């Protein structure tokens, strides 16, 4: 049974909030769009889990894009998610990548770009150097500098029942200032004991009971996480008519068709000479109507 859910919870007596995300299909769809080496799959998985955890903090309609850029074998890895937990992602890489490649071996000298885009309002963008030993530490550093809130992330990737899974947890001190450092460290130590198979295979309620049965935990309604690309034949056609007609005709003459490929979901859209003629005719008639 597919398990793609985000759970928010609150420690009632400790002024600490938490999140738990468990992903299978949503993660599998992202990494199946290309033949990614295992370390790149894992990198996308960690970025996906982090994006899902961060979008849960949005207090408005909008989206968060997490983008890794570097001069290593992986030049780009990006995940986009919105407040409805619709996610998509892609990575670009070159050359051979070792099975045990670390974050810094994958990205080289790189940085993390965090872009928050409200539906209404100004966009915010933060840039963080990849200074931590792993991606979780990079995000923890971001929270410490940008929000001054103690935050811990756990990002887990692995196989469960023969399929790739991704999961993660987040703990964060509430901004009311009443939480103690000892309380937070206590919860960190408990969360450190979680095993991958528990995160991948147990219901959220069981995970939280397994970790925090001595604490009062309020669990909120779950939110589904869904892979959503948004590409379509219509959008691809709209992109074609922005290209010079002579250039499009040259491609049709040489290739017999013009193809647009979606990096996010792997779908290809093919247009032959008749399709292209119709596209430009519709675009021209549309412009005439406007004028």
Curated annotation (Swiss-Prot):
Disulfide bonds join 229-231, 262-265. One of its GO terms (cellular component) is cytoplasm. One of its GO terms (molecular function) is unfolded protein binding. Under oxidizing conditions two disulfide bonds are formed involving the reactive cysteines. Under reducing conditions zinc is bound to the reactive cysteines and the protein is inactive. It is found in: Cytoplasm. Belongs to the HSP33 family. PANTHER family: 33 KDA CHAPERONIN (PTHR30111:SF1). This is 33 kDa chaperonin. The lineage of its organism: Bacteria, Pseudomonadati, Pseudomonadota, Gammaproteobacteria, Vibrionales. The gene is hslO.
């Amino acid at each position: 049974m597919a398990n793609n859910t985000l759970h928010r919870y609150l420690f009632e007596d400790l002024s600490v909030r938490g999140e738990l995300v468990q992903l299978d299909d949503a993660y599998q769809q992202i990494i199946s769009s290309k033949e990614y080496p295992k370390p790149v799959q894992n990198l996308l998985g960690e970025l996906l889990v982090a994006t899902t955890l961060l979008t849960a903090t949005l207090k408005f309609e909008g989206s968060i894009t997490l983008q890794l850029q570097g001069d290593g074998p992986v030049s780009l890895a990006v995940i986009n998610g919105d407040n409805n937990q619709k996610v998509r992602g892609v990575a670009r890489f070159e050359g051979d990548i070792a099975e045990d490649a670390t974050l810094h071996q994958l990205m080289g000298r790189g940085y993390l770009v965090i872009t928050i885009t409200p539906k209404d309002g100004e966009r915010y963008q933060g840039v963080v150097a990849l200074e931590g030993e792993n991606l979780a530490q990079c995000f923890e550093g971001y929270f410490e500098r940008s929000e001054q809130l103690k935050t811990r992330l756990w990002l887990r990737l692995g196989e469960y029942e023969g399929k790739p899974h991704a999961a993660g947890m987040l703990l964060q001190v509430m901004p009311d200032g009443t939480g103690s450092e000892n309380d937070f460290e206590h919860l960190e130590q408990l969360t450190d004991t979680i095993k991958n198979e528990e995160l991948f295979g147990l219901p959220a309620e069981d995970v939280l009971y397994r970790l925090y049965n001595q604490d009062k935990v309020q669990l909120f309604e779950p939110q589904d996480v869904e892979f959503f690309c948004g590409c379509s034949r219509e959008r691809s056609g709209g992109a074609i008519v922005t290209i010079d007609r002579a250039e499009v005709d040259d491609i049709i003459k040489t290739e017999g068709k013009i193809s647009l490929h979606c990096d996010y979901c792997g779908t290809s859209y093919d247009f032959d000479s008749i399709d292209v003629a119709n596209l430009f005719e519709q675009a021209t008639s549309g412009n005439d109507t406007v004028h």
